[in-house]
Amino acid sequence: MKIYEGSILTCDSQDRVCRYLVEDGSRIVYVGDELPAKFASGSRVKLGDRALIPAFGDSHIHFASFATFHAGLNVSDAKSNAEILEMIRSFVPTCADKMVIAFGASPHSVAERKFVTRQELDGVCPDKPLFMIKYDGHTCVVNTKLLDILKEKVQHLRGYHGDTGEMNQEAFFAFSDYVSSSVPPVKLIRNMQLAADHLASKGIGMIHSVSGVGYTMDLDVDMENWFARGLGNGLQMRVYFQTMDVQKAKRRRLPRIGGCFDAALDGCFGSADAALLQPYEAPTTLASCITPTSRWPNSAKRPTGSVCRLRSMPLAMPLSIRPHGR
């Protein structure tokens, strides 16, 4: 039993700040301003100038993807493309995987105000496939080694830019699916454990994982579901199946469905392909729905008693639908 004494921010309906919180066996058993005698024997932690707050919840995370990226190279702190390229150059010799994965690139936070190109990536990583995903998770840049693997499959898809190596829309999803499925299941489970510990260390206590990112037979959905049941660090995990095929979720007895990818309605602002009625970056940025509108309303109505989430990027939040057979 442990007693925390100090500023306890409850975030309850009255927004109370209490003096004591008692934790026993990873459960909160008391919160208040006076410490009951039955808890007096517990060990005390005086917070001093610190405060104790409830854990954060992440309502939309692609956990398998996050676990994969977390195990790779994070370039989000780079201030220039030159710095990104140097980070990759230093990382490649230490990477034992068959593919180099980098995450967090943004043209908005580097001095050049543009993405690195395929040719620049080739200069620092010519011998291994390299997949660098944008901070928004909906655009990537690939080097020639990776492009050559999928070129025949993706060159006619919307969003394909073979000259620069930048992939958007359906071309991006094709590369993302390939990269996801290239990670061995055993390695993915290990990466998931490291990712869960990392989230917990940052104060995140609950995640809604939207799953289904390209694994054969949607193996990542099953692995996340099994992984969630075995978590021992207190992290709560709710799995949403990213699909418009309700039967896939029902066969796995999953009560939740929706997210991005197969359930995405449109693109996102970060990649300037969100579907709006008026242009917002260039005369051609009206974009369009990725999923035909004829599909998603019926899918949302079908699973009576389930929770559906369809992702509309401009809203920056999920549309939570709780059908009741109407």
List the model feature ranges, each with a label.
Residues 20-21, 261-263:
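Active-site and channel-lining beta-strand-loop segments
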Residues 250-253:
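Acidic (Asp/Glu)-rich catalytic clusters
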Residues 325:
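Short, well-ordered alpha-helices that flank and scaffold nucleotide-derived cofactor binding pockets
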Residues 3, 256-261:
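Short amphipathic
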Residues 2-4, 9, 13-24, 28-233, ...:
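Divalent metal-binding segments
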